[in-house]
Amino acid sequence: MSIVKKEGCFGMKIQAVLIDGFKNLSNVKISFANITALVALNNFGKSNVLAAIDFGLEFIKGAIDDKAEMMANSNLIPINSCMFGRNYKFEMEILTEINNIEYQVFYGYEFSWKCNENMKPYIVSECLRIRPENTGQKYTQLINRDSRKALYKRSETGRCSSKINVEPTELVANKLRAYDEIFYADIIRKLNSMKFYMENNLDAKSFYQPDPIIRKGLENMTIDAENLPRVIYQLRENNPQKFDLLKEVYKELFPDVEDIIVKQYMINAGVNDKLPLDVPFMITNAIHVLFVKDKNLKHPINFAMMSDGAKRVFMILTRIILANVANVSLIAIEEPENSVHPSLFQAYIQIVSQLLDDCKVIITSHSPYIVSYLEPSWIHVGVNEQPGIAKFFTFKKSGQRLLQQDAADFKMSTGDYLFSMLADEESNWGEYLECDVYE
């Protein structure tokens, strides 16, 4: 099975994650469609799922000292009496393409939290397996680690039996970055550079302000850049096709918009305006302003004058297009319905789905109306199996039809019926969901 790094390698297409032992999350398995929705009542744990995914990916990329600090973060350690101090577990199922062959990748690790001053956190287990997609072949083990030993597969024809020395808070996947000769070096590189973006800015106003001061590291077109007009200018200059696509889909949602214009204004930043080298900011020699031309107005207006919903929709569409450019594996959007009229939301979600390439989107909501515009197969419902512990379940295929039928019988929308069940502790979820939540 040759997977030597060659030209034409693609990013990591995340298919599923499993999270356990993070705040109030217990064995949460999320299988990703293009768009995946976490639906639950307020204060249930939807945001914890997003935070746990972010934490899991950041832990892979973190330095050894940073990992030790992360493993001692008391704000994240489970404190529910039913799962106090439970180990953190993070597993991913991924698709990646190498040399025109698609591979299934399974990677996961587990560590022990530092629950008190006397405990030393350590990585309990780690595993990496791969197999060609749709071939029926068995997985090939590349990393096999437990609390006593760490092993890796050195050659394509050998077994996963070569010992490797790692620190208690170091991942084998980190150590193998220096092993350029191993045949799966490209997968190791990709694992260590997976990207996740969290969009939880419910007020987008500040992102439209022209500002010559920018954070170092965000000078170029990045998905998490805070200066949106500058990002749009760079998109127009560096990737005009993507810029045209952004304008096209936005005008689909807002038909009165005729054009989106971005202008650059040069400024003279004098010597006295330069910041010290050790500050995390820099002063550029230009500011950028975004304008929108509306068919009902005599002249273009500053985009900052648009409604809150119009600004947030444009910002999110921009992030998604940038995600495809930058090989971001997953974007999380909290409350995408915020400030968006219900009549617009269905078209908005359809456009988001169509824009996605290898990137996936996960959204959270506690709004009944959003559910009515989502495919039931996209939805993971948050249900308490034990008090205070969050679990999420998908619908059975028969449960999807039953939910729609029962909602119609009660003359309710699917979303209203679903949330009425969530609010009722006596609801019988077993008929609807993939597993028995009361077993």
Per-region residue spans from a language model:
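Conserved P-loop NTP-binding catalytic core
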Residues: 2, 7-10, 50-121
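N-terminal pre-Walker A segment at the start of P-loop NTPase domains
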Residues: 2-26
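C-terminal lobe/lid and adjacent interdomain/linker elements of RecA-like ASCE P-loop ATPase modules
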Residues: 7-11, 346-439
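Phosphate-binding P-loop
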Residues: 27-33, 323-326
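Phosphate-binding glycine-rich loops of NTP-binding sites
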Residues: 32-75, 126-128, 313-314, 319, ...
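Electropositive, glycine-dotted interaction segments
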Residues: 103-258
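Conserved ABC ATPase signature
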Residues: 248-254, 259-321, 330-343
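C-terminal structural cap/anchor segments
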Residues: 310-312, 316-376
